[in-house]
Regions:
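"…together with the soluble PPM/PP2C metallo-phosphatase catalytic core" -> "…together
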Residues: 237
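Non-transmembrane, membrane-proximal soluble domains of secreted or membrane proteins
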Residues: 1-179, 183-232, 240, 247-297, ...
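Aromatic- and Gly/Pro-enriched helix-to-coil junctions and flexible linker segments
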Residues: 316-321
């Protein structure tokens, strides 16, 4: 009789549990962009992220490209593919997952997921040159609503500023000094008449080009100027001011960014107090600020020998790129 009583008790609790399930709200609809995938590209000494909102396979180019910080929706698996433009790197966000090497000519699939909102620090863990210790990164996890807002903003391009805009001179300085390597979508690829002359995303190629590259001939990002760099690319700065860090996440753009992001206010960073002095120092003499970046060997940002007035104008312009 003992087993009979035991089975009856189990059945009773099971029925109660199943009835309670009927009272639970139906599962929420599948998140927007459920197929979002990201190519994670390592190069000396920073990380780049190519976002494909409807999946990578068959896509000719990414929907948008960002740098240093990979942004993901909370509680959603996001498939990434690690690869490299130059030497072997290793992508590691300790609080989210293990390590994955980024190897030229290979795209290694992986899944990352965060069950909490916040900003999580990472580090390249494969020695990749003298500035390896300064090759950092962040993963930022947002609520679904904030992630959708972030994506919508990243998809926008900028219009050239009119001559009467207070930041017009700064934009012109950027075009003449920085666009040899960096891109601001909608601005740096226009001709003298203001007409867009190329598709900024097309130059980043697709996953097949990364898979077929192993000998230093990768074409992605090898636009004018950056083609002379060892990696053939420099960070896309279209939405520079929406990121909490720069220069391989070695410098914080906003004081207190960690606490702000952990409180779920990452989207509120633009327009808040920023570390102007640090950004000025970076533009004044970047090789001095980031050790062993080797700009003389086409790695890292060189000293542009800007005047103090030019530095002020450039900083004023960069922090408007939200």
């Amino acid at each position: 009789i003992g087993p009979t009583i035991l089975m009856a008790a189990i059945a009773l609790f099971s029925v109660g549990f199943l009835l309670n399930l009927d009272d639970v709200d139906a599962a929420p609809e599948e998140a927007n962009y459920p197929e979002v995938e990201v190519i994670v590209v390592g190069q000396q000494w920073w990380w780049e992220y190519h976002y494909y909102l409807d999946g990578i396979e068959g896509a000719s180019q990414p929907d948008f490209v960002t740098a240093n910080e990979i942004v993901i929706p909370v509680n959603q698996d996001v498939r990434i593919y690690t690869t490299s433009r130059d030497v072997i790197h290793s992508f590691w966000i300790p609080r989210l997952n293990g390590k994955k090497d980024a190897v030229p000519g290979r795209t290694t699939p992986w899944v990352i997921q965060s069950n909490e909102i916040g900003r999580f620090a990472g580090q390249c863990t494969e020695f990749c040159g003298l500035s390896h210790a300064y090759m950092r990164m962040y993963t930022v996890s947002l609520s679904e609503t904030d992630f959708l807002a972030w994506v919508a903003n990243q998809l926008t391009i900028r219009d050239p500023l009119p001559e009467d805009d207070p930041n017009y001179e700064g934009e012109q300085l950027f075009i003449s000094n920085c666009s040899r390597c960096h891109v601001v979508n909608g601005v740096t690829e226009r001709d003298v008449n203001g007409t867009i002359t190329s598709d900024s995303m097309a130059m980043y190629g697709n996953i097949e080009e990364f898979r077929n590259h192993s000998d230093g001939t990768l074409s992605q990002g090898k636009y004018t100027g950056a083609a002379n760099l060892t990696s053939g690319a420099a960070p896309n700065l279209t939405h520079f001011a929406t990121r909490s860090s720069y220069s391989g996440s070695f410098f914080e753009l906003y004081p207190g960014a960690q606490e702000i992001a952990d409180q779920g206010n990452y989207l509120g960073l633009p327009g808040s107090d920023y570390a102007r002095g640090t950004l000025e120092a970076w533009l004044r003499n970047s090789p001095k600020e980031k050790p062993n970046a080797q700009p003389e060997q086409a790695r890292g940002m060189p000293n542009l020998n800007l005047s103090e007035a030019q530095i002020d104008l450039l900083v004023d312009y960069l922090v408007t790129l939200d």
